[in-house]
């Protein structure tokens, strides 16, 4: 039986360099820090009666391990894989082990308006939704979508 937001947190995963939000390329990513993003996610989940498990790593294998953990203990995944979006078959394969678990991919910038190599995302092949170009508010949209999907009891409602 799918886990609901009422009994399992949303896993929110952040990939490489997102620990530098607010410092790195603010003209692209804005001035909000990762702590600001976490606070937004906590508030958004709480509005739906839920909680979040918010993490960041610069290491692909650690993100894969956390995805494996999420498939057992969480009601959904919001993931900003950052640069791994364009390169990581390992993250795609890990997400593909999460049968029935809703996944939303988030990008702060609009990856389709950037360099051509950023236009393709492996993660999008598994994601139930993709949010790009909405700034850090995209994370709120991701949390809200997971809340809707987890509340409905179906990853692909």
Swiss-Prot record:
<keyword id="KW-0456">Lyase</keyword>
<comment type="similarity">
    <text>Belongs to the type-II 3-dehydroquinase family.</text>
</comment>
<feature type="binding site">
    <location>
        <position position="118"/>
    </location>
    <ligand>
        <name>substrate</name>
    </ligand>
</feature>
<dbReference type="GO" id="GO:0009423">
    <property type="term" value="P:chorismate biosynthetic process"/>
</dbReference>
<keyword id="KW-0057">Aromatic amino acid biosynthesis</keyword>
<dbReference type="GO" id="GO:0008652">
    <property type="term" value="P:amino acid biosynthetic process"/>
</dbReference>
<dbReference type="GO" id="GO:0019631">
    <property type="term" value="P:quinate catabolic process"/>
</dbReference>
<protein>
    <recommendedName>
        <fullName>3-dehydroquinate dehydratase</fullName>
        <ecNumber>4.2.1.10</ecNumber>
    </recommendedName>
</protein>
<dbReference type="Pfam" id="PF01220">
    <property type="entry name" value="DHquinase_II"/>
</dbReference>
<feature type="binding site">
    <location>
        <position position="86"/>
    </location>
    <ligand>
        <name>substrate</name>
    </ligand>
</feature>
<feature type="binding site">
    <location>
        <position position="80"/>
    </location>
    <ligand>
        <name>substrate</name>
    </ligand>
</feature>
<feature type="active site" description="Proton acceptor">
    <location>
        <position position="29"/>
    </location>
</feature>
<comment type="subunit">
    <text>Homododecamer.</text>
</comment>
<dbReference type="InterPro" id="IPR018509">
    <property type="entry name" value="DHquinase_II_CS"/>
</dbReference>
<comment type="function">
    <text>Catalyzes a trans-dehydration via an enolate intermediate.</text>
</comment>
<feature type="binding site">
    <location>
        <begin position="108"/>
        <end position="109"/>
    </location>
    <ligand>
        <name>substrate</name>
    </ligand>
</feature>
<feature type="site" description="Transition state stabilizer">
    <location>
        <position position="24"/>
    </location>
</feature>
<dbReference type="GO" id="GO:0009073">
    <property type="term" value="P:aromatic amino acid family biosynthetic process"/>
</dbReference>
<feature type="active site" description="Proton donor">
    <location>
        <position position="107"/>
    </location>
</feature>
<comment type="pathway">
    <text>Metabolic intermediate biosynthesis; chorismate biosynthesis; chorismate from D-erythrose 4-phosphate and phosphoenolpyruvate: step 3/7.</text>
</comment>
<feature type="binding site">
    <location>
        <position position="93"/>
    </location>
    <ligand>
        <name>substrate</name>
    </ligand>
</feature>
<keyword id="KW-0028">Amino-acid biosynthesis</keyword>
<dbReference type="InterPro" id="IPR001874">
    <property type="entry name" value="DHquinase_II"/>
</dbReference>
<dbReference type="InterPro" id="IPR036441">
    <property type="entry name" value="DHquinase_II_sf"/>
</dbReference>
<dbReference type="GO" id="GO:0003855">
    <property type="term" value="F:3-dehydroquinate dehydratase activity"/>
</dbReference>
């Amino acid at each position: 039986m799918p886990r609901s937001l009422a009994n399992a947190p949303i896993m929110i995963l952040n990939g490489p360099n997102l620990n530098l939000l607010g410092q790195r390329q603010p003209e692209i990513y804005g001035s909000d820090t990762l702590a600001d993003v976490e606070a937004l996610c906590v508030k958004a989940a709480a509005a739906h009666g839920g909680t979040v498990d918010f993490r960041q790593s610069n290491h692909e294998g650690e993100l894969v391990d956390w995805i494996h953990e999420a498939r057992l203990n969480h009601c959904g995944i919001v993931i900003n894989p950052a640069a791994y979006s364009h390169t990581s078959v390992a993250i795609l394969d890990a997400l593909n082990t999460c049968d029935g678990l809703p996944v939303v991919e988030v990008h702060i910038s609009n990856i389709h308006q950037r360099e051509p190599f950023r236009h393709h995302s492996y993660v999008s092949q598994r994601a139930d939704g993709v949010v790009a170009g909405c700034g850090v508010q995209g994370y709120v949209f991701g949390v809200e979508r997971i809340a809707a999907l987890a509340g409905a009891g179906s990853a692909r409602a």
